[in-house]
């Protein structure tokens, strides 16, 4: 959803999964090259699904993660906003977690749990400042009717590519 609003604001959108608005699919090599390419400061948004597949905390210290940390370290200088998701935030390497400004924990709740009729779901996002700090008490609630416009923007069952270790001896 946030990536769509960035697109409407004129930012270039890069994603490791398909979305229904104009974007460029990026690979792990694209991320690794950002820290060494000519300075490009046009505003960009990177959308990353299943971030721990690439930023895996269990590989911390390996060459791949060191290079990926170069990407996260350069993101502010290159005007790149990174939006990512994962089911297990503790599996994400610290290089990405350390630059996280906000964390949203999401859940769905029925509007009326006592009504026997089917009720739309409401999406509730609790906003945290930084990585796993105390909630600010600000809860953002989005009715299902509002969220429906975003449902068709991507396929939640689309598999994302894992990081494939190269055979160059690292």
Please give the residue ranges for each predicted region.
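Conserved P-loop
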Residues: 1-37
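Serine/threonine-rich low-complexity intrinsically disordered regions
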Residues: 3-4, 27, 38, 107, ...
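Structural motif
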Residues: 14, 45-49, 83
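Detector for Asparagine
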Residues: 16-18, 42, 63-65, 107, ...
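Conserved nucleotide-sensing/catalytic segment adjacent to the nucleotide-binding pocket
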Residues: 22-78
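A conserved mid-domain beta-alpha-beta active-site/ligand-binding segment of alpha/beta enzyme cores
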Residues: 117-170
């Amino acid at each position: 959803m946030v990536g769509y609003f960035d697109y409407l604001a004129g930012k270039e959108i890069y994603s490791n999964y398909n979305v229904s608005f104009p974007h460029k699919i990026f690979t792990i090599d694209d991320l690794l090259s950002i820290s060494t390419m000519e300075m490009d400061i046009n505003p960009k948004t990177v959308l990353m699904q299943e971030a721990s597949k690439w930023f895996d905390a269990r590989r911390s210290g390996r060459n791949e993660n060191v290079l990926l940390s170069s990407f996260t370290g350069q993101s502010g200088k290159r005007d790149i906003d990174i939006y990512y998701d994962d089911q297990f935030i503790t599996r994400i390497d610290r290089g990405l977690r350390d630059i996280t400004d906000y964390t949203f924990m999401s859940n769905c709740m029925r509007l009326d749990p006592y009504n026997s009729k089917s009720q739309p779901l409401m999406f509730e996002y609790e906003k945290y400042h930084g990585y796993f700090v105390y909630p600010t008490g600000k809860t953002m609630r989005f009715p299902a009717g509002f969220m429906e416009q975003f449902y068709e923007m991507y396929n939640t069952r689309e598999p994302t590519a894992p990081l494939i270790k190269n055979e160059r001896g690292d």
